[in-house]
Amino acid sequence: MESPLIYVMLVLLNVFVFSSGVIHNKGKERTYFSCSGEGILTGLHTIKLFLTMDNLKVRCFFRNENQSPSKEILGLFTSGGLAPNMIITNSTFYGGYYFKLTPFSNRLEWLIDIPRQNITVNTDIAAVEQWMIKITMHEGLNIYDTEGTLLDLVREPILQWNLGRVLTEMEVRDLYPEVNDIKVTKSPCANDVALIGFMMKPSSNGVFIGKTISGFWTYKECIWHDLTEIIYAELKDEHQGLTVIDLVLTNHFLVILTSLGLYVSSDLRYPTTSQIKLSRAEFCGFERVDYIRGNLWYNEKCFANRESFEVDYVTITFNRNRTLSESSSCFFSKEPFLHWLPCVFSTIKNEKSIPRVITFLIDQETDSGIYLFNVQDTKETYVTVAMLKDGKPSPRPKFPSFHFPSTFTLPLGMIFHPRSHFLYVYGSQIWVSMDGGNTFEMLCNLFSHHVTKTSNSFYTSDIVFIVEDGRILTTKAGLTTYSELGILKDAIFTLYYDQLGYIHKLTPENFDAGSKLLGHGNSGSIFGKRPDLGFEAILVPQYISTNEMYFFAHVPLTMPTNIQWKKRFKTIHLGKTIEFSKTGLANIKNVYMHKTEPVGFQTSIHTEIIVPFGIENSKDSPCLLSDLEITYSGKLYYTIKLLSKNPLHELKSTDVEKSVLIPGYSSFLIMNITDKWTASALATMPQAIKSNLKFLTGSWFLYNFGTAGGRKWSISTRQCNYWIQQDSLDFMSLNLVKYIDVGNTIDFQFKIIPKAMSTFPIPPVSMVVGNPGLVEVKTQGVFDLNENYYLDIHVSGRFFQKGSTSIALVLWEGSSKCYAITLLPTIKSSCSYLRTMHHTPGRHIPPEDWISGVHKDSQGFNMIKTLPINYRPPSHMGISIPLTDNFYHADPSKPIPRNQFHKSKETGKYKQCANVTSRAMCNCSEHQKFSHAVAFSDCKEKVHRFKFPVTQYPVVLEIFNERDKISAEPPYLVTMTEVNMRKNWQLKHNEPENVKKMKHYLEPLLKTPVYNPLGLNLTIQGSELFHFKVSVVPGVSFCELSEEFQIYVDEVPLPFPGHALIAVATSVVLGVLIFIAFVFQLRNIHPLKALKKSIRGNPGLTSSTTVSS
């Protein structure tokens, strides 16, 4: 036997591994934080914060479900040095911020104050993701956290417009009796921003739309607008009977279908007026009666950080067949929705044979169009997928159409689950496709009922189907099972999911989000207690093993055929839990239908036993103390005889409807008692009985799953049965977006932890790739000794092709009560907005020294140069003749130096400081002042300073991603230019054979030298400012990677051209001197001797005379 120490070590190892990363489906604590920002306190178990141009100020209380906030609670934590922190995330961003340790306002609150620029520096109007926030605090082994949202009010497009006259509370109340239905649409990137429209009765008139910024948490928060006059401004004749029919809010446009036409807003990102503008789209031949029966269809996608291939499409369908004079009864358009094209062209002359387009959706992942067709005369329903060519569907299908069975009699619509590739077709049945419409699997058959509306949550992957009888069916994206949330009796209502996945019931006069909100989407007060999915029928257990059991549902042989369905197991029971009142719990693995045998049992379920079911004892059924004999009576029934004649062991009337279970043999349902020792029964496995059977007491058992005295068993949604552990930084979001560049790869790691029975050796997770032609996905999974499942996913790009695809990870055995069953990362084969290239200077200068402008080396040389005001670098014509357009350290109020020559006056243009009169009006931010980009040269004040000459300066380039960085090296070859057209510099680099081949190929195409960034060195022979731009060659990255840096060369001996002139003059003088010396030597002239004599002075002359006689 192995040492117990090994098992202890394994358990501890599992605990330590489990404690790292992010774990979903853990459940919620009964303690939470209540937070508010700028005086807005929701008072709910979720937090709604709003970001304006000011700082984000958040105050938080610590609450307990049965305890109000108090000084004592806060004091307990702060005395231990504890304070919460706030995590802000979305699909591409993760940031952590910390509250002050000392609570605010007399130790009653924690306070945090975050400048806007610490969260985002952008202020332009655009589709931007709403942030998820989590307030969390650790205390010992306890973790307290509360989730919420943060909405940017500055950037959300629809919030920048006035939708029309604001209605008073009394005016809104007057509309309630006239409302016929309600329609809801939400912002694709910020689901808390939503619009609700009233569909009025024919006797009323007007377009009334409500707007919320907090996800309809309270009715008072919703602002109602009257758009009637805005619509009337576009109408020429008919004004009566105007009402909302449908509405869609895309990333950048609002589309409203009314009874008098279709109206499209201008681009919401560019408000030219305060009031929204709507234009009418014309459809020839369609009138008010057609618009009333029309529908809008939209595949919801969030286009935050929008790519060039991302565009919204909207479809309008009219619930009628087209006439021979009309091109189509279905039209679609892409933004800006100016031109509407027919979804399909048909040349069929027989009107009844023309397939009617019920729905047409654009699948943006595979760039295809998906049709849901219905043929009137044949009652045929099918789905066809066509590729898009030049923005139009091709008449040739992508693959053969999928035809639904004839039992699908009422198809009504088709939708994509948002941000995924799961396609749902609904009506009298619900079908789901995992492969974009190629194949479908039936999820639910509603028989005589049908689905009227749907609602979904991208965050929790929930999707609900509203049935016309008020039932609410729900499932998770990718699951092939469903359950029932409950029944709503409201005459007019719809359901809506907010950003965090909480479900809301909306009626004309009230919004209900539920009162118990501990968990994602847990709104028990809306539906009440989840319904018992059981039915009034006798169940017979059939033993398979200690872990498995079948249950057969008995249908009386005399029961009318038309109501026999009431006593059958159905597809809704798949994946649920069957529970016995005495004791016993099992998960339903499969549902089976039986056509002939066994007689009396039309359906059965296969279960996995979690808790053994309780058996009858001898006190309740004394017959258990007797031996048993079973024989076939020849009339469908089997005869059960008690071999003991002891009066204390006889059968009782209460034994009717009980089941006889014998391990290894068929089970029997006692139908009636003939006498004290004999009963007739039905067998669950009659084909397995070959002869008479005898069993000793203790070898057979009785179960009571009958209905006499009330049903003792129930079926319900099983509890959450899996934990999902992810890397804490890579996968903070359930719907993260990852970018993959050319030649790059992405790796994900997950750990699936079963809370009950494991699926070993079958992997518990399935994976669906939306566009498998875009990326290559490899997986590797393994079970550990504790039957936890580890999954590694490796994603790499296939071609130099831009696009996006979802990768769905579905826990197919998971319960819908887990909020995280489906993980939906999106892979974009494109350039990440976080992917940049940076030059790493050879020396580090602290930020505080940059601010002061002084950083000296060991020799006292200041390594920072503060540029003169309105500075421009020299040109090849001289220091005083700058020819560049770029100003540095610009100040329009100051004179421009070096501006005497005509060519210098013609050049030089302000950018940031254009059309202003002072530097303060340039609005240069600190980021712009320190930026190396030529676009911000007006703001640039300080640069790196070097002594002349600069030789072999290493140009070190690094490419940064979200979390890591790599050195720029082949194949990332680069080009380098000086933005001010200066010449006195040169580069040296390494040229291995592969680099030479790429240079020979690229340089003729680019018409510029190409360099290897690895080992690149720069030499500068000129003076003053050099501004370089390094760019990665095209074709090796989706990103246009470039970097700029400046070098100021100072302490040059003499500026050009003085140095050369002195050299020439010196040479001439030396030459003249040599020539003069040569002439003196030739004439025997000795200038030095003459010079010496002149220094001594001239002596007196003497005379000598001789006279002879």
Swiss-Prot record:
Tissue expression from the record = Testis-specific. Specifically present in the principal piece of sperm tail (at protein level). Specifically expressed in the seminiferous tubules but not in the interstitial cells. Within the tubules, it is expressed in spermatocytes and spermatids, but not in spermatogonia.
**Which InterPro entries does UniProt cross-reference here?**
CATSPERB, CATSPERB_2nd, CATSPERB_C, CATSPERB_head, CATSPERB_Ig-like, CATSPERB_N
GO-annotated cellular components: CatSper complex; cilium; monoatomic ion channel complex; sperm principal piece
Q: Which residues form the signal peptide?
A: none
Keywords of this entry: Cell membrane, Cell projection, Cilium, Developmental protein, Differentiation, Disulfide bond, Flagellum, Glycoprotein, Membrane, Spermatogenesis, Transmembrane, Transmembrane helix
Q: Name one GO biological process term.
A: sperm capacitation
Chain segments annotated as transmembrane: 1056-1078
Where can this protein be found? Answer: Cell projection, Cilium, Flagellum membrane
Residue spans, topological domain Cytoplasmic? 1079-1109
Q: Which residues are glycosylated?
A: N66, N90, N118, N321, N672, N915, N923, N1017
Q: Is Transmembrane helix tagged as a keyword?
A: yes
**Is this entry keyworded Transmembrane helix?**
yes
Question: Residues on the Extracellular side?
Answer: 1-1055
Assembly notes:
Component of the CatSper complex or CatSpermasome composed of the core pore-forming members CATSPER1, CATSPER2, CATSPER3 and CATSPER4 as well as auxiliary members CATSPERB, CATSPERG2, CATSPERD, CATSPERE, CATSPERZ, C2CD6/CATSPERT, SLCO6C1, TMEM249, TMEM262 and EFCAB9. HSPA1 may be an additional auxiliary complex member. The core complex members CATSPER1, CATSPER2, CATSPER3 and CATSPER4 form a heterotetrameric channel.
The UniProt function text for this chain reads:
Auxiliary component of the CatSper complex, a complex involved in sperm cell hyperactivation. Sperm cell hyperactivation is needed for sperm motility which is essential late in the preparation of sperm for fertilization.
Miscellaneous note of the record: CatSperb is absent in sperm from mice lacking CatSper1, suggesting that stable expression of CatSperb protein requires CatSper1.
- PANTHER family per the record? CATION CHANNEL SPERM-ASSOCIATED AUXILIARY SUBUNIT BETA (PTHR14705:SF0), CATION CHANNEL SPERM-ASSOCIATED PROTEIN SUBUNIT BETA (PTHR14705)
Q: Under which name does UniProt file this protein?
A: Cation channel sperm-associated auxiliary subunit beta
Question: What is the scientific name of the source organism?
Answer: Mus musculus
